[in-house]
Each structure stands twice: as structure tokens, then as C-alpha cells.
């Protein structure tokens, strides 16, 4: 886009500007001392070619020009207000800057042959307008020269006529919309096609060259063409009006070109004409003749036909013929030439009303919108206009569709509750309790939750008095019915399948211990709090019956002496995955416990609930005396507690296996809690194994021997004891191992900087199973007797290897197994110190070989 940058420094166009060859900016020729009669071939501005320029003089010249133009504008405004007639007012020097020519208009040759731009006047006689000034709007189809660089406005020319009120809408001439052609231009396919045409001959003198003129068209809306072709005389039918010129191609070429959008419009674009005698197309959008301004409409009065002119059969020529009688000053209108399958043809006058579905209606609306963006019907009869009929049809169809939807919606709303039976909501259909209480909730979800809680409270009143803090202790005990518990039929108001149980008033205020809390072997709170598994369903014996109270002599105590269950329940809970339960099938082999036994667990449920259903997660068991494959889908029994002898610093206690309990002499002893359960209460420990790729039937272990003389260690592989295996296949229980256990050093050897320092973060950790406790017992009992290592009651003499015979090695990077061994030794050392601090006297004790930490077993 051109830009004026002058030394004056005004940026408006005075009608005579010149362009710099280097930076392509425009400057006022008067400001740079250039005369209209002496225009240079090449011009460079003061910045590209520095030279002295009088900027003050240039500023005064342009300022005087602007003052003259303002005076002229005031004179014109006074003349228009005093007289509405069209008058001509001439200025002294040039035209108004508003309507002055742009730098891209008109080409003339100066005195020295230089190309320059000059403002031109263009007028057209007729009844539509009086005078029109030179065009000021650029047009893509206007011819222009690539070498145009300078513009000039001759000062001696008469001033331009101003725009009058009658013609102020049309600011440029129709000549700027096209390039006049002397003859048609044919494409290769059109030229080949035209050789085989059989057309009539026409004499050139028969054509009415001056029968029409181009006039501006006043349109109510914007359209692509602002001009039309109007007859100046009476034209009879079948009369050649004028020749149509342009670029000639075939219809196949035109339709296949995507820019023509024929697949959407279904008709030629404006200034494009289809020949009625052949398959040729005349494209006059860029170049052509005055006939290109013939608009199209539904009531056409002309058609384009191809003929041979003056007996020449070389190439055809295209003539605009009149089809009807055309009166003077009547617009020449051509045919739309719609496609044969165009849907607009169904809306022509005399055709029956078409029917379209909603999808076709939307497509029709899109075609109409696109078509009207390029075209405008030139017919004055809008009632018979195809586009008006299509527009009305689309609007009526949409209104009918909207009215149909509204009527359907009204029909749905008209269905009142009185005419339609009301469907109660799920919450309303639920039976309410006979005695309304505060537990009845408003919402459906809260109602069922409160009903669920109420049924639990009525079935198991002892839940009210249980502790509320989390407990991680599993206590195994045999069921014992309370004498004060009576059965009651299910409550009909709540429609609960669970039996409601009331507590006797005599024992309601009595403080019961959890160790004395017994329940029926078939019904417990765990049945209510946990889902029923298939195994539990198979074990049920049908409806509940009144249980008989067993005699106290028949109940075998499972709680070790001096064990306070209530105190244990108040301690910190442990993860339920660290202590898997034992399958009842294992217990049935060696224990008289029946399947009626329940396990009091409070890990995920309320405290004191009797759970008949074990966790379904599968875990491998490490057994001392049993190699069978456990059944984890059945009930299991497990117990863990922490004796007071093993209190550690901080709030994180270590778990102690239930087989370690105190005798009457306050000494810890490793033995089953009862002789009758010695086979079932085996040492069942499990570590959380991250790597589950352990091979079955593979026995791996290593003995770690420590020398108390210098604290060095030797890691020698050895065969693991027979009773300690990862095998899951059922194997008969072998006798206890008799191989000597590894020697564990005393506290003095642990302190001699042979192991990592006692980091509280390492020592204050949570023991995962009974191996740590067994090693703790072994270490604590070897404090007073460091040379005695007890394995199954037999004393093993320490090695006589001297300190000099033992190999010494430089510090090296520890492996994962070595690091775990050292960390566990530090833990055991800290536990021994804690036991001594509490005044516990350790004594030799028999430790199974399976309790020795296996470095290959991953925590």
C-alpha cells in the first residue's frame, strides 16, 4: 500500500506526488522542487539521496493549499444549503483532497517519457446521473503498469466537477471493473471443441452496438455488481444486442475448477455466461465488453448464443440476443442457467410444492445463503422470484418444526399428577419405624445407613461399650455365650434379616472384659460388618437356634497368664497384612478347635467384632513345623501381643509372637500357650515380600558367624534347616533340626565399630514379624552368657578360632543382604539395652533355628 512521507510534513495527497525508487515512499512534487513539465526518470528521496531541502517552504506551500481547499468546502456547503438544484462550483486550484486521485490510477506519458499518474475525469451521459469524478477506489481488475512511479496533476487543467447529491452513491466508473478486450481468448480444450460446431452466420452490421448503456444500479443491499445494462431504445425479440467477450472455456473446465464453487452454487457466477448453443462458457469477470454488466434474474429477457461472424468459421463469437420485447430504459436480464438437478428448479412458478426433510432443509438453506452472497436477482417481480420462494419455504418449515416441538412440550406439561398415577419415590415407599426416632434420616442414603446402624446396635449391644481407638491386636479365643444374651426375632419395622439381641438389665451396667466376651459360633458382628463370602455361606447351618452355654471346664483358655487383653487393645494397631491368619485345615490336624471359632479383629472394623471371614489376600506362610499348603479362604486364627518386658523407646512398639509369654516367675518362655494347641500354635511369620519370584522347593539360607574377639564376620552358605522352608507343597512335618545355630556375638562385639552406628531412625522402626523378636530374645539371653548359643535346648560350644586366624578385610560397600543383617543386629542390640534398662534378667533359652534371620528373605 502506498504511503506519503514528505518534508512538509503533511500526509494528504495534493494530486501531484512522486515515488522514490529505493524506499518506495511518495512525496509531494512541489515540496521537493519538481515541476510537472520536468519529471525525472528516476527519483530518490532526501533520505536515500541526501541533499538540501527547504522544509519551511514546503510547509508553507502545503498549508496554503489546505486553506484554499477549506474555503472551497465552505462555499460548496453554502451553495447546497441555499439551493437544492445541481450546481457546479469550480475551485481555483485542483479538486478536493477527499476525491483526489490515488497514486495507482491512470497512466500517461510525461514530456520526457517518464511514467506518471494523473487524475482523470470520467462522466457518462444518461438519466441516472449528471457527473462522476475520477475513481478513488482501487480495483483488482483495473489495468496498471509495473513501472508507474510518479503522478502528476496538470495545474492548467480545469477543476474537476464535484459530486452532486444525485450521484454521491457512485464514486467510480464502470470502466474500472474490467479490461476491455478486442477479441476472445480461448483455452486449448475450448478451441478444439469449437472446431466441430455447426453455427449460423451473422453479419456484424446486424448487431446493435449502441442499443444499451451501462448505468449504476441502486441496490438495497450490498452485491457484487453495482452496475447494470439498460436499453436505450426499443428492442424487438431475437435481436442481437451486443457481443459478449471474455475468456472462453468448456463447461467441464469451469465446473471442475474449485474456485468457481459450482458444486455448491449449481450455477455460474456473476459475469459468467453459459452458451445456449454449445458447451462453451464465456468468463468476463476480469476482461470483456460492456455486455458483462448484464445481470441475471428469474424473469430473463436475453440469452447468450454462439454464432459465426461475417462468414468466418474459424472461431465462434458470442452474441447477446433478446428473447422478448424490450422497452427503452429497461434492464437487460440474463438467465440463471441453473443445473438440471438444482433444487431451486422445483420452486419455479407452476411447479408443485416440494417436500424436504429437516436435513435436506438445512442443506437447502446453506445453498441459498451461499448463492445470495454472490448474486442478486435483477427481476422486479419478487413474488415469482425463485429465491424469495425458497426463503419463504425455509422460514415456514422452520416455524412449523418449532411449533411442533412446542406442541409436544405442551402435551407433556399438560399431563398433571391427577391424570397420571404418581409414582412414589424410593424413600417414600420405604417403611418407617413404628416408633419414630432421631436416627430416621431424610434422604434415602442416610435412611439406609441409619437403619443399618440401628440393626447392628439391636443385634449386638456390647458394641456400645467397646473402645473407640484403633487396635491392631488379634486375640484368639474360643466362643463362649454370655448368660445374659437372649435371642430375639428380627424387627419387622426395619425389615432386617439380622436378629435383634437385647442385653439383660442385670448385666447391662456390668463392665465386661473383651477376654470374657463370647458370642455364638455362627453369628457375630463380623457377619454384619463384612460381606458374606461363599465359604461362610457354606458353613452356615440355616436359621439361628438357641445356643447352649458350655460349661466353664470345657473351655480351654487361650490367653496366656498375666496377659491383659484390654491393655493390649489400647496400643497402636499393626498392619493386617503383616500377620496372616492360619487356615483351619491346619488346626484341625493337631488342635481340637472347630470351625465355630472366631477371631476378634479390629483392624478394619469396630473393636471387639468377631470375624468369621478371613482376609482373602493370599500370603505365603513360613512355618516351623508345618509344610502344608494353607487354605486362605477359610477361617483362620492368629494372635499377637506385646509383653511388657519388651518396651522400646518412643511410641512405636515391637510386636511379640503369642508363643512368648510369662510364667509365674516373670520369666519369658518359648512354648505354646496350651499343650492341646502345641501343634496348631506354631511359629507363623510372614514378611511383606516385594519380589514374589521366590522359587518353590528351594531352600536357601546362610549362617552368619561372628567372632567376639575382634568382631569380624564370615558369611558362609549353609543348608537351611528342614523345618524352615518356602515350599508350599504338602510335606509331612520332619523332626526338629539339630544342626548348630549360628553364633551371635555379645553386646561388646556389637559396639566395637564393626556395624553401623545406632541411628534412632533405624532403631525406631516397626518389626514386621516374629523373626526380629526371636533374634531379640536370643541376643538378650546371651548378654550374661556370651559363649552359650542355645539351639533346641542344646549348648553349642563357640569356635576356638583365634583372632589372628580370622581374615580381616578393608571396609567395602555393603550389599543389600549385608546391610539388612547389620541393621537387624543394631536393632537387637538396642532391644537388649532396653531390656536391661527395665531390669529384666535374661537367661539361656532355646531358640529354633528357623528364627535366625535369613538374609535371602526380603523384607
UniProtKB/Swiss-Prot annotation:
GO terms for biological process: meiotic cell cycle; negative regulation of DNA-templated transcription; negative regulation of gene expression, epigenetic; regulation of DNA-templated transcription. Residues 66-163, 408-436, 483-516, 533-592, 621-740, 779-859 are annotated as: Disordered. Residues 95-111, 565-576, 701-719, 779-807 have a biased composition (Polar residues). Gene3D superfamilies: SET domain (2.170.270.10), Zinc/RING finger domain, C3HC4 (zinc finger) (3.30.40.10). One of its GO terms (molecular function) is methylated histone binding. Keywords: Activator, Chromatin regulator, Meiosis, Metal-binding, Nucleus, Phosphoprotein, Repressor, Transcription, Transcription regulation, Zinc, Zinc-finger. PROSITE patterns: SET, ZF_PHD_1. The modification Phosphoserine is found at residues 496, 533, 575, 714, 716. Residues 117-131, 414-431 have a biased composition (Low complexity). A zinc finger (PHD-type) spans 5-51. This is SET domain-containing protein 3. The gene is set3.
